[in-house]
């Protein structure tokens, strides 16, 4: 008799392998959708920069506000930046606001005007006109906050990335994180990248690297006097810019070399010189000046500093062709002058920096190069000039630098800076 074929129950189809396959496909689709969402949220946004000015009604302008090196300039700038930041953090723009920076404090009448750049991150489809209106509405509330009386300007200018770079590279001591108003600070490894130390100069004798230096204006380089002891004629010297001494971004002839009259090759006292360039240097992301400290700036033992240069990696070795950087600590003159150290050879116009264990140090070919420190506003100041030391990287024998604060008036007399 005919018997129909039995129907397979649905449960027979869903074997463990089939269930696993469905789960894998489902998870894969969900992961893909999440990835697309993350990509959209991350890459749909871009940075927007704006410039504005603020009149400070209850602060009188003084000469101390003329330089970012002074305590007064730093304190007032930080107060203004904190007020603006707090206002945006408590507004509807809190998720879009990134950072603000006072570019300059200037005189207007007897009062102070602060020029400020602000950074936001928002959708690429952002309506700039609407964004500008929203920013203005937040800034209008500044007059009633904090203990500064601020009158925000109604003028808010949208800046391109290039505009922002042009504005911020006119300020001394700006590294890449400040030029882009980034929240990240990265200094890693020993190899410097283009733009990391934009004030670094290679002073070359007959087109061969001989000493380092630091650009302190568009016409002047700060360096060590001992670099020119045997070769004082400027016609043999050029200054190059960029991380490579073999293929520099820019090469400029030297017009004049002004070494300190009191330099002693015996005591190494007054080991400082300024070099005048033959032509003005145009500032950019990769080439601009470092800040000079105030004569009263306190260099604190134990604080972090960075030394940069093309010096040899070991005592007696060859110079390198790509710029290197080293993190060191400031060491007190008392510690540096102990019998285990330099036994009193470190004079008041000198500064010690290195590591107690040795290892990281300036070496031959680094002479004249800068020792720099960062302030609370991410501006970098040259506090030392590579001068001398016993060999390189030995315990208790740190590098000895010319103390720039001790020669601040001399630098001003020679250069007008």
UniProtKB/Swiss-Prot annotation:
Broad EC category: hydrolase
- Bilayer-crossing regions: 18-38
Which tissues and organs express this gene's product?
A: Highly expressed in the esophagus, tongue, and trachea, low expression was seen in heart, lung, and adrenal gland. Isoform 2 is also highly expressed in the adrenal gland.
Gene Ontology cellular component annotations, sorted alphabetically:
extracellular region; plasma membrane
Gene Ontology biological process terms from the UniProt entry = proteolysis; symbiont entry into host cell
Asked if the Swiss-Prot or TrEMBL record annotates the protein with the keyword Zinc, the reply is no
**Domain of life, per lineage:** Eukaryota
What residue stretches are annotated with the Peptidase S1 domain? Answer: 186-417
Active site per database record: 226, 271, 367
The places in or outside the cell where this protein is found are: Cell membrane
User: What are the SEA domain coordinates in residue numbering?
Assistant: 46-162
What is this protein called in UniProt?
Transmembrane protease serine 11D
Q: Which taxonomic lineage is given here?
A: Eukaryota, Metazoa, Chordata, Craniata, Vertebrata
């Amino acid at each position: 008799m005919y018997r129909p074929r039995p129907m397979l129950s649905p449960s027979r189809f869903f074997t463990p392998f089939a269930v696993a396959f469905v789960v894998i496909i489902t998870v894969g689709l969900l992961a893909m959708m999440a990835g697309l969402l993350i990509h959209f949220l991350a890459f749909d946004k871009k940075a927007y920069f704006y410039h504005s000015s603020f009149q400070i009604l209850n602060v009188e302008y003084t000469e101390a506000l003329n330089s970012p090196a002074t305590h007064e300039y730093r304190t007032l700038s930080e107060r203004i930046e904190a007020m603006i930041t707090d206002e945006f953090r408590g507004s509807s723009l809190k998720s879009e606001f990134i950072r603000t920076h006072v570019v300059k404090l200037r005189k207007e009448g007897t009062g102070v005007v602060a020029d400020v750049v602000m950074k936001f991150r928002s959708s690429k489809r952002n309506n700039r006109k609407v964004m500008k209106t929203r920013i203005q509405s937040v800034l209008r509330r500044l007059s009633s906050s904090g203990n500064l009386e601020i009158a925000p300007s109604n003028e808010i200018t949208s800046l391109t990335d290039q505009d922002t770079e042009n504005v911020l590279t006119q300020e001394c001591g700006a590294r890449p994180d400040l030029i882009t108003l980034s929240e990240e600070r990265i200094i890693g490894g020993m190899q410097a990248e283009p733009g990391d130390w934009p004030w670094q100069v290679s002073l070359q004798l007959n087109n061969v690297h001989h000493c380092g230096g630091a650009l302190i204006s568009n016409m002047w380089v700060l360096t060590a006097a001992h670099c020119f002891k045997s070769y004082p004629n400027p016609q043999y010297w050029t200054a190059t810019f960029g991380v490579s001494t073999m293929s520099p971004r820019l090469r400029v002839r030297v017009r004049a070399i002004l070494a300190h009259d009191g330099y002693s090759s015996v005591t190494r006292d007054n080991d400082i010189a300024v070099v005048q360039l033959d032509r003005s240097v145009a500032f950019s992301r990769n080439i601009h000046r470092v800040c000079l400290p105030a004569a009263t700036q306190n260099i604190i033992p134990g604080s972090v500093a960075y030394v940069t240069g093309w010096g040899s990696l070991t005592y007696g070795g060859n110079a390198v062709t790509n710029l290197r950087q080293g993190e060191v600590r400031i060491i007190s003159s008392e510690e540096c002058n102990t019998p285990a150290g330099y036994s009193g050879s470190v004079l008041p116009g000198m500064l010690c920096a290195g590591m107690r264990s040795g290892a990281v140090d300036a070496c031959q070919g680094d002479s004249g190069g800068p020792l720099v420190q960062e302030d609370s506003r991410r501006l970098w100041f040259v506090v030392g000039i590579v001068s001398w030391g016993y060999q390189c990287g030995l315990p208790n024998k740190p590098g000895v630098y010319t103390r720039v604060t001790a020669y601040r008036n001399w630098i001003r007399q020679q250069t007008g800076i």
